[in-house]
Amino acid sequence: SGKKVDAWMGIPYAQPPLGPLRFRHPRPAERWTGVLNATKPPNSCVQIVDTVFGDFPGATMWNPNTPLSEDCLYINVVVPRPRPKNAAVMLWIFGGGFYSGTATLDVYDHRTLASEENVIVVSLQYRVASLG
């Protein structure tokens, strides 16, 4: 549509759930110093990638499109440009039955929602499957 958005991807909301934090509740993210590089989509949380239906677009479009990692607790924010004064904020929590999924799938293109519906879209990665 030619409409513009601003996007911040991969903002940590919790400490990486590694080592002794693996099976614990998420701990608040530690402060960072300087400027956070929020220009690339975050890792997808560890999960079993579905290969039952083969390698065709209708099936693979639901498979993670970013690297799988236990370091995956991040949010993404997409805002229409120019920035609206009183926009609604939509929190997008992807489905997947706590078994699989990721907020970064191309079918969940937040830019379209933000630009066409004039809403601020926030999405998050969360642990799924055996680590969820």
UniProtKB/Swiss-Prot annotation:
InterPro entries: AB_hydrolase_fold (IPR029058), AChE-related_enzymes (IPR050654), CarbesteraseB (IPR002018), Carboxylesterase_B_CS (IPR019819), Cholinesterase (IPR000997). It is found in: Synapse; Secreted; Cell membrane. It comes from Culex quinquefasciatus (Southern house mosquito). This is Acetylcholinesterase. Its main location: other. The lineage of its organism: Eukaryota, Metazoa, Ecdysozoa, Arthropoda, Hexapoda. The keyword rRNA processing does not apply. Belongs to the type-B carboxylesterase/lipase family. It is a peripheral membrane protein. GO terms for biological process: acetylcholine catabolic process; choline metabolic process. One of its GO terms (cellular component) is synapse. Rapidly hydrolyzes choline released into the synapse. Glycans are attached at N37. Gene3D superfamilies: alpha/beta hydrolase (3.40.50.1820). Disulfide bonds join C45-C72. GO terms for molecular function: acetylcholinesterase activity. The keyword Disulfide bond applies. Keywords: Cell membrane, Disulfide bond, Glycoprotein, Hydrolase, Membrane, Neurotransmitter degradation, Secreted, Serine esterase, Synapse.
